[in-house]
């Protein structure tokens, strides 16, 4: 992958928690700067570490850069023809009603549909991989989702601002297949929604994926897209190289 927002977030959270585990009184930084292979990433922490029955970590917010949407991509006309052919071959004209091509480090095809499911992404994902346009592409199917009072409370507590827009998504990642979550994908989904004029980009937007929820915002079109979400320890281990 060209970029991995989830990986950046997890790396920053690991850096945050290790000194805290050794000494809970250690001062927690507001930001951590990470040096990547081709760039640098700054991660902000939204909130504080809260102790209780289970330790609650703050959300980690990462600047993900700016997206190129549809005609901002040089090959948009060719991709449009390719998508039209696939829609015809599958007898799925609904694919053409609301779709976007987004580049944000990685490339993404996003289809907004009335009905989505894991079975559908397993059907569509592999089909879009084979093309002379790319060596694979991330594919997402999305739909709008009702925001509950609980969603508003949780987001207000975590972000200082309640969300008013929420989308559900399933993901097929280039070279990996169906995955639980995709950080650059969630940002690209939000970018496609803003470009369509469906919501205010300066407000946090929620994207629900099988692996959990991410929050996305972009104060203005000239700013970086910011992705915020949790990171939790899955396991520890050692690798001998």
Segments predicted by a language model, with ranges:
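Active-site proximal loop and beta-alpha junction motif in alpha/beta enzyme cores
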Residues: 1-3, 8-181, 188-241
């Amino acid at each position: 992958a060209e970029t991995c927002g989830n990986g950046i977030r997890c790396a920053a959270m690991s850096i945050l928690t290790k000194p805290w585990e050794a000494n809970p009184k250690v001062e927690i930084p507001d930001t951590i700067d990470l040096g990547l292979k081709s760039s640098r990433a700054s991660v902000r922490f939204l909130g504080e570490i809260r102790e209780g029955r289970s330790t609650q970590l703050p959300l980690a917010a990462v600047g993900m850069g700016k997206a190129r949407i549809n005609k901002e991509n040089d090959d948009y006309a060719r991709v449009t023809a390719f998508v039209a052919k696939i829609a015809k071959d599958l007898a799925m004209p609904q694919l053409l009603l609301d779709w976007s091509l987004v580049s944000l480090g990685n490339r993404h095809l996003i289809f907004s549909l009335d009905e989505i499911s894991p079975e559908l992404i397993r059907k569509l994902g592999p089909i879009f991989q084979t093309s002379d346009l790319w060596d694979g592409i991330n594919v997402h199917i999305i739909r709008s989702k009702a925001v509950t009072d609980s969603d508003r409370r949780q987001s207000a507590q975590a972000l200082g601002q309640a969300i008013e827009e929420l989308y559900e998504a399933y993901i097929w990642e280039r070279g990996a297949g169906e995955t639980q979550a995709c950080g650059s994908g969630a940002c690209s989904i939000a970018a496609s929604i803003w470009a369509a004029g469906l919501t205010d980009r300066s407000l946090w937007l929620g994207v629900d994926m099988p692996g959990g929820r991410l929050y996305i915002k972009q104060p203005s079109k000239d700013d970086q897209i910011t992705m915020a979400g949790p990171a939790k320890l899955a396991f520890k281990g050692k690798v001998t190289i």
